[in-house]
């Protein structure tokens, strides 16, 4: 009976990896009589032995390292057991030829090729990880650019409407100057955001503080007054006098109100009605609801409309879909720890709901909010 050759292995894996199917099969096989090697296996937790990552130049875990016999080999990925099974017969054959004293040149060539293949695989893994990191960074920057570009429309539209109102004699020159001054200040802040897009994270563009949502909703309604008055649309509000302050970024909350009210106006009939409700839902949250009596949204589309780059097809009388506004709203609400959703039925209209955290003396020096 042939004596089993020793095979020294190190499995670098976190505890949760060990419950994975392929690693369970691997460990079971190495402990069984079917394995034709005398196995010496060391299982290492990377957090307890981080030096192993550097020593063996590991770029991904779990990883199985063949320490001896030389040359060293490393297997990583989701099919470690399959990779090992491919190599076991080869290692056994190499052991037999060494016992017979046969020096096979092809074996040396294979060994060199194997090492080169391993180095190439390592480089490919590093490149994949770098590519993934860069892709995520580019996507994040694109989202920031879309948000800021979308937000630029508001002060520009307001300034244009103010100029038109002054020409029609609806406001005096002093009021026009005041509106233009405030809108230019908003554009200046947005230009600062644009300059920071390449160097900052999404959350860093938020400045949460104690604010009054009732005032913000009133400002948004007033800003869109020309649109709803022209179409004779009524806007009803239900805002309790004892509504608590919330902890949020004032500019971003204003943007959410403007986007949702604009959508409600867009999908409302002339002489229609929009209802805005603010409720102190729990000790932790204020819930805002904006309802219209428009065309409604199919159930199949109610989650998709909050995704990036999703626009519903034309709905009625030339009205285009929701576009970027709702994905921006979702990201703003989620950065504040809240959530946003829609309740809608085709032909019956839509109600958009979102939640904002109640002010509870949060640390004003807090740099960003936690995404919920």
UniProtKB/Swiss-Prot annotation:
It catalyses: ATP + protein L-histidine = ADP + protein N-phospho-L-histidine. Residues 147-360 form the Histidine kinase domain. Its EC number is 2.7.13.3. GO terms for biological process: circadian rhythm. It is an enzyme of class 2 (transferase). Disulfide bonds: none annotated. The modification Phosphohistidine is found at residue 150. GO terms for molecular function: ATP binding; phosphorelay sensor kinase activity. PROSITE patterns: HIS_KIN (PS50109). Keywords: ATP-binding, Biological rhythms, Kinase, Nucleotide-binding, Phosphoprotein, Transferase, Two-component regulatory system. InterPro entries: HATPase_C_sf, His_kinase_dom, HisK_dim/P_dom, HisK_dim/P_sf, KaiB_domain, Kinase_SasA, Sig_transdc_His_kin-like_C, Thioredoxin-like_sf. It holds the Pfam family KaiB. Member of the two-component regulatory system SasA/RpaA involved in genome-wide circadian gene expression. One of several clock output pathways. Participates in the Kai clock protein complex, the main circadian regulator in cyanobacteria, via its interaction with KaiC. KaiC enhances the autophosphorylation activity of SasA, which then transfers its phosphate group to RpaA to activate it. In addition to its output function, recruits fold-shifted KaiB (KaiB(fs)) to KaiC to cooperatively form the KaiB(6):KaiC(6) complex (independent of SasA kinase activity). Homooligomerizes. Interacts with KaiC. Participates in the KaiBC complex, whose core is composed of a KaiC homohexamer and 6 KaiB. PANTHER family: HYBRID SIGNAL TRANSDUCTION HISTIDINE KINASE C, TWO-COMPONENT HISTIDINE KINASE. The N-terminus interacts with KaiC, while the C-terminal histidine kinase domain autophosphorylates and is probably responsible for self-oligomerization. The N-terminal domain stimulates the C-terminus to autophosphorylate. This is Adaptive-response sensory-kinase SasA. It comes from Prochlorococcus marinus subsp. pastoris (strain CCMP1986 / NIES-2087 / MED4).
